[in-house]
Amino acid sequence: MRKKLWRAAALGLACVLIPSATVQAVTVNFGTAAAVATDSIQGWPAAPATVSETAVLIDADTGAVLYDKGMDEYRYPASTTKIMTLLVAVENASPRDTVTFTETGVRDVNWDSSNIGMKLGETMTMKDCWYAAIIESANEVCAQIAETVGGSEANFINMMNEKAKALGCTRTHFANAGGLPDANHYTTAHDLAKIMRAGLQNARFRKVIGAVSYTIPATNMSEARRMHTHMPLIAKESNLYYEG
């Protein structure tokens, strides 16, 4: 059952590359769906239609590409950025670490940015932060993870980009930990799949990425926060629930 959740989460996150009209540092195509390259392979099974502009399906064990819909075209990753944020965090921090929210984190608590309403001086564990970043896509939590794990946001972003290079992601550059709009923040479906594949090899990553719900205990400044996934592929109440 856990493996089904990881696969569903991987499928959803790898396909949701969000277009943006921001002036870009590279040529980022948006608004136009890519052609399915694998459909031109003789004898290869035709895949079902996807609504995403680009997509890729790879074998998690070997990395072999099974489906290619513009997999190497640049796109803005938006909150799928958090796949890398989580991976770098679980590899470089303990779930028991205490995270204290500074101006770095709370600056991203506003109406048009996904957040869980963290307050200046509020504390919770790194583990709680991981779940908030993935289940609620909390941007202020991602910023605070970055500062706490990296010593500074800038250093954590460097860690993200170095990790991307190490994984063979040649068309990816991160500018922040949450996926906020930035011309210098881009990736491809293929690179994102490589990151997800690496993450699935980490037990802590797998547990967080496949979580359907989680409760952050009461903090020094807030009551307990109950969170439930917004990813329809792993939510049983959704008509898009993937049973694997």
Where are these regions (language model features)?
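Gram-positive cell-envelope targeting signals
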Residues: 1-29
